[in-house]
């Protein structure tokens, strides 16, 4: 059995992963790392706030924490290599560069979204952006009121795929909001808008708009379990991989 440690175990994703590990035939929960009191039962797993304990008792570590916590984890792993699944979003360019650097000594899979459906949506977005070259692209993401980062990492990934398909860099065309007399929409811009409210797990819409017609691609998550199952699948997959930075597409064969 593969021993999986959860970094950020007391959060919502930690709960979902731990719940989905209970009946898994290939992996078990070995360590629940948290700086907060554990709000639910983790069985025989070790509960700790010590990174050494987490690393010593895990074959693979799944991270769903916050930016500072994820950065600390990765820095520790650079001198104590261990396969990592990084699901924390909002790390910024410095965090992404740190992950690339760390992947030279351990296998790391970084994904802004662990679901199969979103992985397919990314591929569809790239295809549609290339084929529908003259269409305007607008992306809208919706999440629960407690989500702290905006736009979502998934929305930015979708926008990156759209820009890449048109040989553009996202930074050069991204629009985050519109207000006032801003003038007409430019040809290449890609808008990424965020809505927050209620308990929405996650909804992403990529719209392609032209005169006389439009297409909208949509993914709605109704349960965090879909992300948890994807993270566990990735953890099992990455255990035997060589040091490298992997994507969810590598794991899913897309």
From Swiss-Prot:
Task: List the GO molecular function terms.
Answer: 4-hydroxy-tetrahydrodipicolinate reductase; NAD binding; NADP binding; oxidoreductase activity, acting on CH or CH2 groups, NAD or NADP as acceptor
State where (S)-2,3,4,5-tetrahydrodipicolinate binds. Answer: 144, 153-154
* Principal location: cytoplasm
One Pfam annotation, family name?
Answer: DapB_N
Tell me what reaction this enzyme catalyses.
Answer: (S)-2,3,4,5-tetrahydrodipicolinate + NAD(+) + H2O = (2S,4S)-4-hydroxy-2,3,4,5-tetrahydrodipicolinate + NADH + H(+); (S)-2,3,4,5-tetrahydrodipicolinate + NADP(+) + H2O = (2S,4S)-4-hydroxy-2,3,4,5-tetrahydrodipicolinate + NADPH + H(+)
Coiled-coil segments on the chain, per record: none
Q: Name one GO biological process term.
A: lysine biosynthetic process via diaminopimelate
The entry's keywords? Amino-acid biosynthesis, Cytoplasm, Diaminopimelate biosynthesis, Lysine biosynthesis, NAD, NADP, Oxidoreductase
EC identifiers of the protein: 1.17.1.8
- Positions contributing to NAD(+) binding: 8-13, 87-89, 111-114
Q: Which PANTHER family match?
A: 4-HYDROXY-TETRAHYDRODIPICOLINATE REDUCTASE 1, CHLOROPLASTIC-RELATED, DIHYDRODIPICOLINATE REDUCTASE
Q: Write the protein's name.
A: 4-hydroxy-tetrahydrodipicolinate reductase
Q: Which organism is it from?
A: Campylobacter fetus subsp. fetus (strain 82-40)
The gene that this protein is the product of is dapB
């Amino acid at each position: 059995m593969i021993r999986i440690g959860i970094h950020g175990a007391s959060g919502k994703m930690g709960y979902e992963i731990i719940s989905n590990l209970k009946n898994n035939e290939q992996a078990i929960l070995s360590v629940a790392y948290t700086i907060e009191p554990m709000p639910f039962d983790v069985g025989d797993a070790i509960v700790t706030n010590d990174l050494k304990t987490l690393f010593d008792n895990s074959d693979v570590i799944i991270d769903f924490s916050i930016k500072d916590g994820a950065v600390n984890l990765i820095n520790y792993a650079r001198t104590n290599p261990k396969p990592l699944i990084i699901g924390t979003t909002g790390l910024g360019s410095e965090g992404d560069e740190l992950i690339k650097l760390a992947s030279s000594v351990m296998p790391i899979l970084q994904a802004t979204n662990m679901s199969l459906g979103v992985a397919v949506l990314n591929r569809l977005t790239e295809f549609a952006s290339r084929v529908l070259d003259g269409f305007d692209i607008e992306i809208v993401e919706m999440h629960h009121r407690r989500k702290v980062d905006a736009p979502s990492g998934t929305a930015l990934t979708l926008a990156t795929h759209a820009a890449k398909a048109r040989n553009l860099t996202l930074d050069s065309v991204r629009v985050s909001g519109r207000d006032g007399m801003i003038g007409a929409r430019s040809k290449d811009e890609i808008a990424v808008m965020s809505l927050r409210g209620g308990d929405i797990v996650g909804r992403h819409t990529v719209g392609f708009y032209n005169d006389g017609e439009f297409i909208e691609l949509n993914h709605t998550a109704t349960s965090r379990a879909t992300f948890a199952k994807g993270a566990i699948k990735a953890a099992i997959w990455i255990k035997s991989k060589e040091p490298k930075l992997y994507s969810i597409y590598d794991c899913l064969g897309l």
